[in-house]
Amino acid sequence: MIKSIFKKVSIKMASSSKILSWSFGEVTHSNFINFKNLKPEPNGLFCLKIFSDFELCCLKKKCFCHNDKFLNLKKAHTGYKVGHIKLFYPAVHIWYIKSSHSNISNILNLSYKILEKIINFKLKVVIKSYDIKIKKFNLFIFDKKIKNIIFTLSGAKALKKLLSDRELFIDCLILKIKIKKCNSFSKLFSILKHINKILIFYYSGNKPSWMVLKKIPVLPPRMRPLIALSEKKFASSDINELYKIVLERNYKLKKMTTYLDPKQLLINERISLQESIYALFDNEKLINPILTSSKRVLKSFSSLIKGKYGRFRQNLLGKRVDFSGRTVITVEPNLFLYECKIPIYIALELFKPILYYELKKKKIITTISFIDDYYKKNKKQIILLLKNKVKSYFIMLNRAPTLHRMNFQSFKILLTEDKTIKIHPLVCLCYNADFDGDQMAIHLPLTNNAKVESNYLLLSINNIISPSNGNAIIIPTQDIIMGIYYFTFDFKNKSISLNDINDIINFFEFNNYNFQINIKFNNKKKINTTLGRIIINYLFFKNFDYFLNIVFKKKILTYLIKYLFDFNQLSKIIIILEKLKKIGFLISTYSGITISYFDLIEVKNTFLINKVVFKLKYNNNIFSIVELLNNFFVKIIIKKIQINKTGLKKTNNLFIMLDSGSRGSMLQIKQLIAFRGFFSKSNGDIIKDPIFDNLKNGLNMKNYFISTFGARKGLTDTSLKTANSGYLTRKLIDVSHDLVIYKIDCKTKTGIKIFLNSYFTLVELYKNLYGRLLLFSVSLKNKILLKENTLIDNKVLFLLIKKKINTIFVRSVLFCISNRGVCCFCYGIDLSTNKIVLIGVSVGIISAQSIGEPGTQLTMRTFHTGGVASYFFYSDNLIISNSGFVKFKKCKCVINKFGEVIIVSLYGEFMIFNKIILEKYKFYYGTKIKFRNGFLIKKNTKLINFNDNNFYIYSENIGYVYFKKENNIVKNYCLEDNKFYYKTLKNFKITIINKSIKKNYFIPKNFNIVVYCYDYIFPGEIIAKLVSVTILKSSIIGGLPRLSELFEARIPKLKALLSEIDGVCKIKFSHLNYIITIISKFGFYKEYTLSCLRKLYINNGDYVKIGDILSDGKPDLNEIINLISINYLLSYFVNEINSIYFPQNIYVNCKHIELILKQMTKKVKIIFSGESSCQQGDILFLEDAINENFSTLVNSRRLSYYKRIVTGITKTSLESLSFFSAASFQETNKILVNSAIKNRTDYLLGLKENVLVGRLIPAGTGLIKYFKKKSKSSKNNLDFKNRKKKFYINYF
């Protein structure tokens, strides 16, 4: 039995002597009970002598003694004692031989197929030989006759002999000599694999022969129960049946050996015993598993511990609890934000023991079962007693699926006679609940600590701000928003002069809530406003310090609630929210807003538009036409929808719903009024025949059936993405659960360098900087403006902008160097409280929930978006904010005939300097700049001015154009330019010839060639272009699949080519491939081969740097971290994930993504082992590699070299320091086996492992006990000392 207080859990391999020391007796009989007297069989699987604490009076079958103590046996008495089975012939453990990386195979250096043949007596192994020709380990066919001077063995006994004869230390020395002499990479890999496994056994002290079993432990009966259903029927655990088969076969083998049966019969019986032991440990893995009479596979040890219904996940990580219930939810607008109504029947059941205690004290009832009868007779008394008791309790409500912490909140209890839970309408957004049959679970906290937590931490009014992005989550929605919008809408009626707020409210009530009145209100200045706007402004700003004379929409109300929260006005927010709720429901009821068929305006001349589309459809790209029509119709809809054509009202109901943000989107209205657009098939491919009809006028038969494809796809996607996003959340939780705030400051000296001028909008800058801390102090004119570790809030941010500070260094969780978890200063503010994060906050769990929760809103399909120009090339109007001199750096430019500088290299740097660098920008190919090197420019000057978003290819030299008119180009009409161009169908080559100089240009597919053959052109002239609307639609996997690809650090299917050296490019065309050669200035070169179907972003003669993207596709994360830097990886990773969420209007704060990336980048790979104890190719934690190098440096030895790697979240979770956490995630058997071989110890530092063993988690309120324990010795030091002592080798 496990002691209640323990600090760590260890796992080791068990030898036969260890199993014997656990055992309380040998099990010899296969029978469970004696069916005559229904007593357990002596020496059987339920023998009381072995498994019970009680001593029996006698062992007779027909025992009727009065002192028969096992008749009153309790479950606890058969709970913890272990027995054993002594095998008559050794058997191999299936987990050590049939796993993906067979341990026995690695140690003996024999393949799995050979081992299987040895076990099944098809081959025999030479154990000892006196013949020079035949050596040890030689294999022979079993039936072959061999001389007497050679000793051979077969079966599990042979493997046991081979494993016990291994001298691990000598094997290591031999293999090290082989490594030095090895020339082949494949041989080196196999030797390293072999030496790794041997070293693990050598350092751990485990003997390889223990993998072959002589004794098997028998679990206590409580873990494999036998339940009586009736007098002669019993339900037994599958483990009992498997034990029974093992015992029967073992007994049969023993009998056959004693009677000296023929050799072949003995062999067959040994094989059957081996198979039964395989089945006991892992029945599902066998080709012919043991089945029941109904042909069901019996559940073995493996199935008991692994999977969703195994011990780890069903019984340890998640448990069913008492004092809980569930029922349907309905809305109750008259509640306060912190209240909910519970049905009396549920409350009576939950509080039954408490009521029983009170009634028993008064001597009214004697047993708990009488409460129901007493309630029927004395309803009023029980309800009064219940109401008194309910006052001191707060109930916890939970709605599944619990994707984030806002799904679990506590409320004050009110009782109702209805049979549903009634909740406040404003908490629906937190729970993502509606009232179409949703159910909620009720939980009653009982202990004092649980009550305190539910009364304060979980209370709904303390969860107004979302921890994922810092935005308000308890906000007015739907009907309330619509009512407030209508209340503050300007109907442009005649205005009345009123100055006092009380007069305005009285006037509103006196006129039967007529709010369509304009008022001339005197607030410092006379304002012509509406009655509704004055009342809403009075709620937010009582003294009218500010006055917002606008229509109040959802976004504005959200910003105002966040504004009040920033200034610590929580009590004011709650009052305002309650008043907004009442006003919203009142006005939406009085207004009677609803939509009808006549609210859907008609777009005129649609017939002519469709006619034009029909003609153009066969000459142009269909995607471009739909995009043009989309923009065209949206403008018409916005203009026409605002005013109802009947003229009865001044507002359109549909427009109110859309503009207020209460319901609907422009996409839905476009489908109702204009056209439906593209639909996808069931496999995700887009049907290239868009629907130009709308839902108002109806669809024809063809379009109706095309619509059904999309509807089916939508339904299947919903079910798939729910499962996938749930799995993604689980993976994120598993990788980040041990990230908790344990320190105030880690004293790191590394962080992120941020160029304030590189952000084109203030919103972007605010989102990235707000809530971070400065790494170094900020100076201006040799005076410290801001000290280090200053929190960047609104004031600091505006000070930086005002003082024109260009570069700052900020702290990031990615560079936090805390021994355990993360420090407060690196994390910054807690977004849900708007204050510096407190010690004990489980930031890892919050990050995982923040990324995983909006996952269900993402799309599963492959969507079509802009390709080359929109993804890799940036263009925008840029205005300089400082006066200074122009300087170009690291770029190749040409000057066109208009005197404009055009960048023709992959990218270039542009700087404004005046003694020091004031501003720095990065421009990409094709950027036109008005100024040259050394020019003086003033602030607020427009630097670049793009009139269009097209992508152009420019000439770099003067000369004649030459190209062959082959099948690769076709003449095509361009709708945008109203001209005919040659369009490229494949990659195409254009040459510009000037005397002896030739320059080749490779034009990608789908570009329009602007020049003609034999044209004479100058530098900077356009050769070819890709119009923004007709950009090749590249299929980019969007939504969840792309998110999963990034977090798993998979190599993309279409991988971008990255330059590994600095140098000049030379491109050749060979067969169907490009041969790209990058020649360095030092003479060496690097050659790449790329398919001609891919797009190149470079031309002949371009100078590229390490890490430059040379072709289309997505870069590999491991290449980014090794070729460029971890800082670039951070910015790329954050931008990629935000680009997935942004189209769905979801914002996830950068720090959450950084925390996950921290976990993904904490490993290194050893490139050169030097004289350290590491092996080449080992994957270690970064801290372990640094510690190892320190110890080698102390001993004056050669250091090891390593490189940072990015590991996927699944792999990171499985390679966790805690084997408990890893085993409960997935691949349970493999992790437990590898951990046992290494003698691993789990120090229970994370949250999951503490939940598994039933302790308080080391986070939040559970952290106080851990701090008390740490006063004597630091657990961090212990952890790292133990990790340093151990030899951590990653299995291949």
From Swiss-Prot:
Gene3D superfamilies: 1.10.132.30, 1.10.150.390, 1.10.1790.20, 1.10.40.90, 2.40.40.20, 2.40.50.100, RNA polymerase II, clamp domain, RNA polymerase Rpb1, domain 3. Disulfide bonds: none annotated. InterPro entries: DNA-dir_RpoC_beta_prime, DNA-dir_RpoC_beta_prime_bact, RNA_pol_asu, RNA_pol_N, RNA_pol_Rpb1_1, RNA_pol_Rpb1_3, RNA_pol_Rpb1_3_sf, RNA_pol_Rpb1_4. GO terms for molecular function: DNA binding; DNA-directed RNA polymerase activity; magnesium ion binding; zinc ion binding. One of its GO terms (biological process) is DNA-templated transcription. Its cofactor is Mg(2+); Zn(2+). It is an enzyme of class 2 (transferase). The keyword Zinc applies. GO terms for cellular component: DNA-directed RNA polymerase complex. Coiled coil: none annotated. It catalyses: RNA(n) + a ribonucleoside 5'-triphosphate = RNA(n+1) + diphosphate. Binds 1 Mg(2+) ion per subunit. PANTHER family: DNA-DIRECTED RNA POLYMERASE, DNA-DIRECTED RNA POLYMERASE SUBUNIT BETA. DNA-dependent RNA polymerase catalyzes the transcription of DNA into RNA using the four ribonucleoside triphosphates as substrates. The RNAP catalytic core consists of 2 alpha, 1 beta, 1 beta' and 1 omega subunit. When a sigma factor is associated with the core the holoenzyme is formed, which can initiate transcription. This is DNA-directed RNA polymerase subunit beta'. The gene is rpoC.
